[in-house]
UniProtKB/Swiss-Prot annotation:
Annotated region (RCL), positions in chain: 368-387
Predominant location category: secreted
Physiological role: Inhibitor of serine proteases. Can inhibit trypsin and chymotrypsin; relatively ineffective against elastase.
Disulfide-bond pairs as recorded: none
Family under the similarity heading: Belongs to the serpin family.
GO molecular function terms listed in the Swiss-Prot or TrEMBL record: serine-type endopeptidase inhibitor activity
Gene that this polypeptide is encoded by: Serpina1c
Protein's name in the database: Alpha-1-antitrypsin 1-3
Keywords on record: Glycoprotein, Protease inhibitor, Secreted, Serine protease inhibitor, Signal
InterPro entries: Serpin_CS, Serpin_dom, Serpin_fam, Serpin_sf, Serpin_sf_1, Serpin_sf_2
Signal peptide boundaries: 1-24
SUPFAM superfamilies assigned to the protein according to its UniProt record, in alphabetical order: Serpins
The species this protein was found in: Mus musculus
Length: 412
């Protein structure tokens, strides 16, 4: 193999988010004192917040008429792990594209931050069913740099698999089996085709199963209309929930804000724009505003109508990451010499991200809650999520955005 020939690398960020919403007895006030406020945790949350919003806006720029769903944590983890073996401009572009300021944060601290994040997400004692995994798939005649392997295992809990990429169907099956097992069967064909020059693949997945602290009662679910746009309406099963809910109107965003807690340590922030204000919401949304919503919890008597939904996202990360400044890794100028000891250069030939989300009121019974309330001075708000809205799901200990989505059509 001469140095003029470039070998291919596949990057796969695959995930599943499944959200059943039963088996919770009561709502507890959020204890912000229990949040992990370590420097590493704060650093990763800040950068992932910026990264999440940048990615979201790029996806909206590519298409503002379709559902959006992705995991900032999954994508960032995959690229950060790849940066362990990158050098020069390739290295700088990756970390700066992930919104890290390299003059303020050392590379060692960045990887320690991801290490801490993954340890937190994979805690076995958490009520939240949340797990992540990283797989390195190496051609059986390719020798990787030992330092890269050690750091990938230490900081990113990576598993290493030896495969024969010359047998593309066999190699594809090994990768797909890893993702399918990690996502408990929610993603069954993460890789559809392998480039013929692929010799190394990196796969990341994240699986999330959450149960609402305050569940929906399936008996209250009725068919209702969802307005995709001014001329399109679809029928959806609309769930209903009443009681003391964390909901308020944000004049800055011209949107209603609803916070829903999961059993464990996760919170979903739903943003329902006023009529004609979706573009304003998307342009104005910031991590600072989201942080305020998470810190300043306010419950009031309210009723919400929310669609049962299932959406997915599949993205070519080359077109998604390039506007964020990550370009060198995809072309022949890529410097990934810290990954392999071979003379032939390595470049990222494929980069795929897949995501699946289900929100429903799974289960045959919901918790019974008796609430005694004083008569309010004003009528409680009734929120109908019957037109496009945004949402972000956070892990509370690290305040990291696990998932970001936009629901344009809940039936697709």
């Amino acid at each position: 193999m001469t140095p003029s020939i470039s070998w291919g690398l596949l990057l796969l960020a695959g995930l599943c988010c499944l959200v059943p919403s039963f088996l919770a007895e009561d709502v507890q006030e959020t204890d912000t004192s229990q949040k992990d406020q370590s420097p590493a945790s704060h650093e990763i949350a800040t950068n992932l917040g910026d990264f999440a919003i940048s990615l979201y806006r790029e996806l909206v720029h590519q298409s503002n008429t379709s559902n959006i769903f992705f995991s900032p944590v999954s994508i960032a983890t995959a690229f950060a792990m790849l940066s362990l073996g990158s050098k020069g401009d390739t290295h700088t572009q990756i970390l700066e594209g992930l919104q890290f300021n390299l003059t303020q944060t050392s590379e060692a601290d960045i990887h320690k931050s991801f290490q801490h994040l993954l340890q937190t997400l994979n805690r076995p004692d958490s009520e939240l069913q949340l797990s992540t995994g990283n797989g390195l798939f190496v051609n059986n005649d390719l020798k990787l740099v030992e330092k890269f392997l050690e750091e990938a295992k230490n900081h990113y809990q990576a598993e290493v698999f030896s495969v024969n990429f010359a047998e593309s169907e066999e190699a594809k099956k090994v990768i797909n089996d890893f993702v399918e097992k990690g996502t408990q069967g929610k993603i069954v064909e993460a890789v559809k085709k392998l480039d013929q020059d692929t010799v190394f693949a990196l796969a990341n997945y994240i699986l999330f199963k959450g149960k609402w602290k305050k569940p929906f009662d399936p008996e209250n679910t009725e068919e209702a209309e969802f307005h995709v746009d001014e001329s399109t309406t679809v029928k959806v099963p609309m769930m209903t929930l009443s009681g003391m809910l964390d909901v308020h109107h944000c004049s800055t965003l011209s949107s209603w804000v609803l916070l829903m807690d999961y059993a464990g340590n996760a919170t979903a922030v739903f943003l329902l724009p006023d009529d004609g204000k979706m573009q304003h919401l998307e342009q104005t949304l910031s991590k600072e505003l989201i942080s305020k919503f998470l810190l300043n919890r306010r419950r009031r008597l309210a009723q919400i109508h929310f669609p049962r939904l299932s959406i997915s996202g599949e993205y070519n990360l080359k077109t998604l990451m390039s506007p964020l400044g990550i370009t060198r890794i995809f072309n022949n100028g890529a410097d990934l010499s810290g990954i392999t000891e071979e003379n032939a250069p390595l470049k990222l030939s494929q980069a795929v991200h897949k995501a699946v989300l289900t929100i429903d009121e799974t289960g045959t019974e919901a918790a019974a809650v008796t609430v005694l309330l004083a008569v309010p001075y004003s009528m409680p708000p009734i929120l109908r999520f019957d037109h496009p809205f945004l949402f972000i799901i956070f892990e509370e200990h690290t305040q990291s955005p696990l998932f970001v989505g936009k629901v344009v059509d809940p039936t697709h």
